[in-house]
Amino acid sequence: MLEFQELTVKEGARLRPYYETCDYRLCEYSLGVKLMWRDYLPPWFAEAAGCLIIRNCIEGQYVFDYPILGPEGDAGAALTAIEQYCGDKELPLVLSVVPEDKASQLVLRYPRVTVISERPWKDYLYHTEDLAQFAGRRYSGQRNHINKFRRDYPDAAFVALTDPNDPRLTAFWTDYEAEFHKTGPLAKQELALAQEMFSLLDTGWFCAGGMLAEGRLVAVSLAEKCGGTLVNHIEKALYSHAGAYPAIVQAFAACY
């Protein structure tokens, strides 16, 4: 039977290779989401049939990610292991956030199954070149904001961030918190989690960068490469610097 253990930062190096090659194009299939939101999921993991199996707990119910294949992974055998686990524990079998191309396979595997599409929770997917160029009428608003930002801060430049102890990052969080006026507990916790993620820069699991203007960081971003998709976990910019948000989006896409 599957033996699950809690997914923590300590297990990151062990699990990151699964996510590094995972091409499901869903943010839930990333190490960053599992770490950043571990208090809400919370994720536990097991390995079977060459696959990573994640068990989350959503609103008190155990739900499973679709198996993430390793080099010799067998998704069918991993699903069988999940089925046996649920049978032994007398749990309903619930697969959550299933990749679209896997859903039809599951319908064939399970004759009596309910499929639910949660539209509000769907991810936004962009072509890299669209964000790197912001070309065409669709992105005219973003271009206008970036042009204003460039006029206001002609010295602005994108820099890669790799050191969690970079003093420029420390200064950015101080500046950001000074402009941060959200009082809700979730907003405050999200900010704390974002800072925690940047503390993991030296692990090599994530890529990060920032926009420098007038000698200081005015925007930062952190993402994770999962297969052919760059999963953007964090974007923060100083509200006082209009256009910094689309500027960091464009520069980040062009760099990574």
Task: Enumerate the predicted regions with their spans.
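Conserved donor-binding loop and adjoining core beta-sheet/short helix segment
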Residues: 17, 28-101, 212-239
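Acyltransferase donor/substrate-recognition loop-hinge adjacent to the catalytic core
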Residues: 111-183
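A generic secondary-structure signal
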Residues: 81-85, 148, 175, 197-199, ...
